[in-house]
């Protein structure tokens, strides 16, 4: 299972890459494998605001429809619109071109609620 060290993680299998007061958010390798082939992605609008753990996107796969939850509260600065035409990028490159949104962090203290790569890897061992 691919768990990059430079990211933080949630128990719902989202990742976040923080850069100053902004961050990229996506779903983990584990999540995309569990979902199967992604066939549709519903993304929020730029300037939409979400609280921590609030659903902000929907991934539809051949197996299921799944909500994606924001690891920390924030305002959407950019949505990865390439996924609207190529939803399979979530499967192919979940940590690169398969990212979902870029957000402006509302409260950096919420990052303390997230798991490091080591903690997430241990968590995956428990759930598998």
From Swiss-Prot:
GO terms for cellular component: cytoplasm; glycine cleavage complex. Keywords: Lipoyl. Pfam families: GCV_H. Signal peptide: none annotated. PROSITE patterns: BIOTINYL_LIPOYL. InterPro entries: Biotin_lipoyl (IPR000089), GCV_H (IPR002930), GCV_H/Fam206 (IPR033753), GCV_H_sub (IPR017453), Single_hybrid_motif (IPR011053). CDD domains: GCS_H. Disulfide bonds: none annotated. One of its GO terms (biological process) is glycine decarboxylation via glycine cleavage system. Coiled coil: none annotated. Its cofactor is (R)-lipoate. It comes from the Bacteria. The modification N6-lipoyllysine is found at residue 63. The glycine cleavage system is composed of four proteins: P, T, L and H. Belongs to the GcvH family. PANTHER family: GLYCINE CLEAVAGE SYSTEM H PROTEIN, GLYCINE CLEAVAGE SYSTEM H PROTEIN-RELATED. The glycine cleavage system catalyzes the degradation of glycine. The H protein shuttles the methylamine group of glycine from the P protein to the T protein. This is Glycine cleavage system H protein. It comes from Halothermothrix orenii (strain H 168 / OCM 544 / DSM 9562). The gene is gcvH.
